[in-house]
Curated annotation (Swiss-Prot):
Name by which UniProt lists this protein: UBX domain-containing protein 2
Keywords: Phosphoprotein, Ubl conjugation pathway
PROSITE patterns given in the database record: UBX
Disordered, as annotated region: 115-143, 273-331
Keyword Cell cycle part of the UniProt annotation: no
GO CC annotation, single: nucleus
Modified residues (Phosphoserine): 371
Any one GO biological process: proteasome-mediated ubiquitin-dependent protein catabolic process
Segments traversing the membrane: none
Ranges annotated as biased composition (Low complexity): 311-326
């Protein structure tokens, strides 16, 4: 035994209080490393037969080292595929700000509804990983709901109330306002069932400027400050000249009923000052005679006595004569129309098919589908077949106070009576 080995044995014995023989055994197993040999000695409980003790120790006394399982991979959607992307922009374009989200002006910032409807939805590339399948199923369901209840952005005007009044006045169109609550399912049903109907859209495009407002955003709150609203959804028609609310509804409509309601309004009101139809604001009524001063009564009497009575009588006579002649021609023309000209079966609904309502004097209504290419005479033929007495007595059909007998050879589309309500009157 050399000096180094003797020193190791002595140190081992001093620390472990064991014999030199045990020290040599443990040092031999530890390849002369004193620290390892001492550790082996205490872990084996000071067993003399270190060879067998060291070999058996791992399975008997030494605990098996536990290796922590790797962290499971997780995936999260950093950008919602239904994020509000403004139409007409691209991901690489300059209209996108920080993080890939589009820069939107004040009019485009619209809160999503309860189904995350957005003006446009730009699909993002999906990864070809196993985890993407579950996400795609959830995303597709959300996408279907968003599409189903999506607001009618194709007919909504992104204007403020003041801007809408200016625009509608220049175009001689009414302002149709729909006030909604973003979390109300009844409001979402309007988007799904009413505003997506093509017949409703057609009437709106022809006669109205359409605004859809949310009651918790500034344009909607401004509307409520000017016009009291009991509940939502709220639908109103505004006169663009004065801003007056001339018609309002707070109930649900079927598309057919709403088209009828709009046509009833258009039948009775006009923005054309030269028209003979009613102004919704009401004509200024003349002051009653008893409320006039003596001077006003005198001026009225003088004006009446000097009012060209003879010329007025002659003009009225000429007008009556012309009307009688016109009615005679119309009656003969309508009388020649055979009710058999109208097909027994209605055409199936489609893009080239419209619904026309006939309102009778007693309040009854007849509704039928016609092709847009059908002549107006076919509507007369239908009326002669369904209206009692129409095949024997002269009658007229009018739309917006204008008789349609002069348009008998025109198509329904050319006459502009698609999705309208016509007034029936016996002559």
């Amino acid at each position: 035994m050399d000096g180094d080995e003797a020193s190791l044995v002595a140190n081992f014995c001093a620390i472990t209080n064991s014999t030199p023989e045990k020290a040599q055994e443990y040092l031999s197993v530890a390849d002369g490393d004193l620290s390892t040999a001492i550790t082996l000695f205490f872990e084996s409980g000071g067993v003399t037969d270190v060879q067998s003790s060291y070999i058996e120790a791992p399975s008997q006394t030494e605990p098996v080292e536990e290796i922590r399982a790797p962290i499971a991979p997780t995936r999260e959607v950093l950008v919602d595929p239904l994020a509000d992307m403004s139409a007409g922009t691209s991901i690489m374009g300059n209209n996108f700000g920080f993080g890939g989200f589009p820069r939107m002006n004040r009019r485009q910032r619209r809160r999503m509804g309860i189904f995350d409807q957005s003006p446009s939805q730009i699909p993002f590339p999906s990864s070809n990983t196993e985890d993407s399948s579950e996400e795609s199923d959830s995303s597709s369901r959300a996408s279907r709901l968003a599409k189903l209840f999506r607001p009618p952005y194709d007919i909504i005007s992104n204007l403020s109330l003041d801007e809408a009044r200016i625009e509608a006045s220049s175009q001689k169109r009414w302002i149709l306002v729909n006030l909604q609550t973003s979390t109300s399912f009844e409001c979402q049903v309007l988007n799904r069932d009413l505003w997506k109907d093509e017949s409703v859209k057609e009437v709106i495009r022809a006669h109205f400027l359409f605004l859809q407002l949310l009651d918790d955003e500034e344009p909607g709150m401004e509307f409520k400050r000017f016009y009291p609203v009991r509940s939502t959804p709220h639908i109103a028609i505004l006169d663009p000249r004065t801003g007056e609310r001339v018609k309002e509804w707070s109930k649900s409509f079927t598309p057919a009923d709403f088209v009828i309601a709009l046509n009833d309004f258009l039948e009775g009101c006009t923005l054309d000052e030269t028209s003979g139809r009613k102004n919704p604001l009401g004509a200024k009524s003349q002051k009653p005679v008893e409320a006039m001063s003596e001077d006003e009564q005198m001026h009225k009497a003088i004006a009446a006595s000097l009012g060209n009575g003879n010329s007025t009588t002659e003009s009225q006579g000429e007008s009556s004569s012309q009307q009688a002649e016109s009615h005679g021609v119309a009656d003969d023309t309508v009388h020649k129309i055979d009710s058999a000209e109208c097909d027994a079966e209605e055409p199936s609904p489609g893009p080239n098919v419209t619904r026309i309502q006939i309102r009778m004097p007693n309040g009854a209504r007849f509704i039928r589908r016609f092709s847009l290419t059908d002549p107006v005479s076919k509507v007369y033929a239908y009326v002669k077949g369904v209206a009692e007495g129409a095949d024997k007595q002269p009658f007229s059909l009018t739309f917006q106070r204008k008789s349609l007998w002069t348009s008998l050879d025109s198509t329904i589309k050319e006459a502009g009576i698609q999705n309208t309500a016509l007034q029936f009157e016996f002559q």
